[in-house]
Design a protein with these regions (language model features):
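Extended beta-strand/beta-hairpin segments
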Residues: 1-49, 59-154
Length: 154
């Protein structure tokens, strides 16, 4: 529901714009600024926003066919922990959905769909939360250019 169900790769490119400031851009040109500093979401907050946004889209697309919400908020929370080896990660991730619809037949129909849609998003459709819950390897490669001489980093 939240994404087209084709198996095509997804990608974004990150560019540094200043110390601690970055822009992520997708192939279509959409972009978001983030980093460390006033007015910027941190990478951890972007992860929380991605989880909330993925499920929000699933719920919004379906309920909006019946009725336009008068309120639609999703709060994503998590506890950042420091493991014994010094590594950081989040645990206890949680989404809280706050929706309201008009008090008419269409609004009541949309309101009645929300719990089922949230469950379906969590269990089946939200690629972001399902990836986090199931875990996946994050690989990397490095290419460094020093004084104009390109080469692979050791």
């Amino acid at each position: 529901m939240s994404e087209i169900n084709d198996p095509a790769p997804r990608s974004v490119e990150l560019t540094r714009t200043a110390t601690g400031h970055y822009t992520a851009r997708n192939a279509e040109g959409a972009e978001i600024a983030f980093g460390r500093g006033e007015g910027l979401l941190s990478p951890v907050e972007l992860l929380l926003a991605a989880i909330a946004g993925c499920s929000a889209i699933d719920v919004d697309v379906a309920t909006s066919r019946s009725s336009e919400p008068s309120e639609f908020r999703v709060e994503a929370t998590g506890q950042k922990i420091l493991e014994e080896n010094g590594a950081n990660r989040l645990e206890d991730l949680h989404l809280s959905f706050h929706l309201a619809f008009p008090d008419d037949a269409a609004g009541r129909k949309a309101a009645g769909m929300v719990q089922r849609l949230v469950t379906l998003s969590h269990d089946k459709y939200c690629t972001v939360s399902r990836t986090v819950e199931h875990g996946t390897a994050v690989g990397h490669d490095v290419s460094v250019d020093v004084d104009g001489a390109a080469g692979e980093a050791p």
